[in-house]
Amino acid sequence: MAEGAASREAPAPLDVAGGEDDPRAGADAASGDAAPEASGGRMRDRRSGVALPGNAGVPADSEAGLLEAARATPRRTSIIKDPSNQKCGGRKKTVSFSSMPSEKKISSAHDCISFMQAGCELKKVRPNSRIYNRFFTLDTDLQALRWEPSKKDLEKAKLDISAIKEIRLGKNTETFRNNGLADQICEDCAFSILHGENYESLDLVANSADVANIWVSGLRYLVSRSKQPLDFMEGNQNTPRFMWLKTVFEAADVDGNGIMLEDTSVELIKQLNPTLKESKIRLKFKEIQKSKEKLTTRVTEEEFCEAFCELCTRPEVYFLLVQISKNKEYLDANDLMLFLEVEQGVTHVTEDMCLDIIRRYELSEDGRQKGFLAIDGFTQYLLSPECDIFDPEQKKVAQDMTQPLSHYYINASHNTYLIEDQFRGPADINGYVRALKMGCRSIELDVSDGPDNEPILCNRNNMAMLLSFRSVLEVINKFAFVASEYPLILCLGNHCSLPQQRVMVQQMKKVFGNKLYTEAPLSSESYLPSPEKLKHMIIVKGKKLPSESDLLEGEVTDEDEEAEMSRRVSGDYNGEQKHIWLCRELSDLVSICKSVQYRDFELSMKTQNYWEICSFSETLASRIANEYPEDFVNYNKKFLSRVYPSAMRIDSSNLNPQDFWNCGCQIVAMNFQTPGPMMDLHTGWFLQNGGCGYVLRPSIMRDEVSYFSANTKGIVPGVSPLLLHIKIISGQNFPKPKGACAKGDVIDPYVCVEIHGIPADCSEQRTKTVQQNSDNPIFDETFEFQVNLPELTMVRFVILDDDYIGDEFIGQYTIPFECLQPGYRHVPLRSFVGDIMEHVTLFVHIAITNRSGGGKAQKRSLSVRMGKKVREYTMLRNIGLKTIDDIFKIAVHPLREAIDMRENMQNAIVSVKELCGLPPIASLKQCLLTLSSRLITSDSTPSVSLVMKDCFPYLEPLGTIPDVQKRMLAAYDLMIQESRVLIEMADTVQEKIVQCQKAGMEFHEELHNLGAKEGLKGRKLNKAIESFAWNITVLKGQGDLLKNAKNEAVENIKQIQLACLSCGLSKGPGSAAEAKGKRSLEAIEEKESSEENGKL
C-alpha cells in the first residue's frame, strides 16, 4: 500500500546560546511533527493529548479522616503561578514500568494558560525564510509573551498581550505564503500573532497540532478578556460544566457527605458517557488518588469532576468550541447559528433551530433553560446523526427516476444463492434475504432439474444442500420490495429440462402474479422504460425464442457461467458454446431483458435492439475497457450490459466494480458473500439515492452526443475539477483487529484515505501512526485531492494497525463523493463484514472547493484559486469539415469570455480571503466577519458604511483609514465588481455558447454522410466524429459551468449583504442601508425569478 504522507524529520534541538542570527534552516526546522519518524514510516514516541505540569495534591492520612477533609478542603483547582519552579522543555527521557497514564488532557482555558506559563519550544519563522528555535512562555502576570534565547534586550524579546490584534491558525500570512519552506511546514502546526497598528505578524510553528491549538486558544482567551477581570484563576470550578457536574454528584450522593463509593462513581460516569470502558474509569481514579498520595475506595466531588473532565473531554472538540464561541466555555444560540452556517454548510438557520438543538443535546438543566451548549452537549451533538458525514438528502430517493433503465447503475448480485465460496459453499436461502435487504436489484437464480419434478437451486460443486425453486421464489416475493420499490431483475440461469421449465413458469406466475413484467417492448421506442414506470415489477432476464416463430420449443445458446468455470478448471473448455432447449412458456416471460451474445460494438450498434442485454465476463469486459473505452461508454448509453466475475475466481473473490462503472456498465455483479475492499466500494456506492439500488449515471455518460473515455488521466471536457480537502482529526474507541494474534488491546492506528474513480482521480494518502492509543488517537493531518469527475468518485477511509500480528484491519467507511457533507463530521466505521461498529468513529473536517470556477452551488459553493500563472483555455478541436468547423469557430470567443469571467471572480474571492488571513476553504461569511472585526473602531462604530449601488453592496470609508484597511476594501470592491460582471453578462455569453451547440447538433445525424462526401473514411472519419463529440461536450459543459458560476455569484452577493447587515457595517451615516440592503436582496431574487420564468 502506497504511503501518501511525506517523511518528516525531528525538530532541531534548542540552542540556548544562539541568537536571532543563528537560524535552523531546512526541512528539519520546518517539520510539523511531534516526534522523529522511525524506519518503515512509523512514528515513535507520539503521544495523544498534551502533557501538563502536575498539580500537587493534598495527602489524606486515612480513609477515616476523609469525610472531615472533604468538608474542610476548599474545592479549587490550583494553578502554577511560578513556572520557574517547573521543569520545562527538553525533559530528560525516562523509562517507566507503571501502568498509570502520565498525561493530562486540555479541558479548559485554565489548562491552556497553565501550559503557556510552563512554556514550550516553538519555531519562529522570519520573512527572510529563516527559522529559529525559541522557548516561548507567558508571563506570570499574564501581560506579555516572552521568548529566549535572543540577542535583543529582555524587554524587547516580548510581545504585550494588549498589542495583539488577531491570532490566526494555519499558514495564513504573507510570511508563510511567500516562504520557500512553506510546503514543508505542517498547516495544522502553524499559527501567527498579528500585533500593532500595522498588523505585523509573529509567525510560529509548534511541534504538534495539539500545541498550536493550545497557544491559539489561550492567546485568544487572553485577548478577548483583556478588558475584563481574568476569572480563570478560579480554575474550572465556576464554569457551567463544573456546576452541572457538582449537581450530578450531589444528586447521587444520597448521604450528603461529599464522597461516594468508587463503584457508584464509575457507574455514574458510564451513565453520562456510555462509550467509556469501566477499566479506564477505574484506572483514572487510581491515577488521581496516587497523585494525591492516598488509596481509598471512595471518591470526593472534586475527584469525580476531575476524572470526568479528563476522561470525557476531547481536546480537539474543546479547541473547536473555544474557536466558535470566541473563547467562552460554551456556545450560545448565536454561536451555534454561526457554526452551522459557516462551518457545516447549513442554510436558512434560525435561532429557534439552534435553541432546539441546545434543548436536545445539552446535558445540564441550567444550560437548556438559559440556551447554551457546553462541551459535553456539543460533543454529543457532533456525534449525533445530524453531524453524520453522509448527506441526509441522499438517504431518500433524490435522483430523477424517469430516465431509461440503461441510464442507471444497478445494484447486482452474483451467485446470490451462495453464502460461501462458489467451489465448496452450500446454497442457502439467506443469501437472497441478505442481498434484497441490502437493496440489490439484480439477483441470480441458477435452476436445475430436481427430484419429484420440482426445479431446484444448488451449488453443483456441493450438493449437500438443495433449495427448492418455489421456496426461493416465495422468499424473493416476500423481500423483493422491502428495501426498494424499484424493479427487480431476475437473472435466470436455466439448466432444466422442458417439463421442469414449464413447472418453473407455473410457479413464477403463481408466486409473483401481476408483479411479473411481460409486456412486449414497443418497436416505436428507442430506450427501455424508466425505473419509475417499472415500480414493483419483477423482470426476467434470460434467453428468448424468435418472436416470428410459432414453435412451442426451440434451441438457444447456453450462457452457463458456472458450467464454463467448471470446464475451464477441468480443462474441457474449447471455446465452443453449448446449446439448450427452451420452451415457449418460459421464453414469453422474458420481455425487456432478452439475453444476447456480444459480437462487437459496430455490429451491436447496428443490429441490437434496445431491449436486449449482453453479459460480459470480467476478462472480456476488462479487455474491451482497455482497448475500446469510448466505444464501451457509447454502447452503454442505450443498452444494458452485465459484467460478472471471472470464472477463475473459485474463492468467490470480487472484481473491482469501479473499473466497469467507469465504462458505464450498469449491472456489475458482486459476490455479496465475500467481504473486502471491493465489496466495500459496491456497498458504499449504492448507499446513495436512498439505497434504492439505482444510481443515475453522470450526464456525460448519458448524453447522446458527448465525449468521455473511461481511461482518461486528465481533466474531463466540460467538467470543472474540484478540490477535496479532508482533515483527519481524531479517532474514537478503535477496537483491536479481529484477527490479531498479539496479546493485549494496545494498537498503533493510522488512517488511509483512498480516492476511487476514473484513473485521473485515483489517489491515496495516509496519516502518521499514533502510538499505543485506541481510545482517542489524535492525527490532525490535512490532505487535498483533485477530483475531475465528482459524480463517479468514491472516498474510502481505512483504519489500520501499524504494529499488527496477523491482522491489521480496524475499520473502514466508503462514501460517494456526492454524498459528503461539508464541515466537522463523524464517520461511523464499519467492520470487515460491513457492520456498523457501535461508538467507533473517525472525526474529520470536509471542505470542497473549486479549482478554477464552477463547482457546487449552495452549501458547497466555496472558491479557491489553484491554477497556473498563465490561464489555460479549453480548446475546441478541428473536425475537418469546413461547414461545421466554421460554426465551432464562432464559439471560441464566448468560451474565452466565460472562462475569464469565472476565473476573475474566483481570483478576486481568493484575494479577499488571503488579506483576511483565511484559508481557501473559508466561506465568504467568515471573510466578512474577519473584515468587520478590523473595520470596527474602539468605540464599537464601523469605520466604513454599507452602500447599495444598483443592488450590489459596496463599502465606503467614513473618513481616513489605515493602509491595511484600504487594501482590504480595494480587494472587496474588486470581488463585488467581478461578481457583478459575471451576474450581468453570464446569460448573454451562455446564450451564444448554446446557439453554437444547437447549430452544431443540426449536423449530428448527417455527420457520416458529410464526412464521406469530403473523402473522410476509416480512422479519419472516426477521428472527425470523436472531435465533434468533444466539441459538443465542451460547449455544453462550459455553458453549464457559466450558469452555475452565475448562481454562485448571486448566492455570494446575498451572503455578503446579509453578513454586512449582521456584522453592523450598515450603522453610521448610512442608517438606511439595512432597509435598502434588504430591498436589494428582494430585487435580486425577483430578477432571478423573472429570468427563469422567461426561459421557461
From Swiss-Prot:
Q: Which residues form a coiled coil?
A: 1040-1060
**Which SMART domains does the protein's record reference?**
C2 (SM00239), PH (SM00233), PLCXc (SM00148), PLCYc (SM00149)
Q: Give start-end positions of Basic and acidic residues composition bias.
A: 1075-1096
Organism in which the protein naturally occurs: Rattus norvegicus (Rat)
Q: Where is the PI-PLC X-box domain?
A: 399-543
The entry's note on the tissues where this protein occurs is: Expressed in brain. Found in the granular cell and Purkinje cell layers in the cerebellum; and in the hippocampal pyramidal cells, dentate granule cells and pyramidal granule cells of the cerebral cortex in the cerebrum.
Q: Return the protein name.
A: Inactive phospholipase C-like protein 1
Ranges for domain PH come to: 114-224
Q: Which residues carry this modification: Phosphoserine?
A: S48, S78, S96, S570, S1080
PI-PLC Y-box domain: residues covered: 586-702
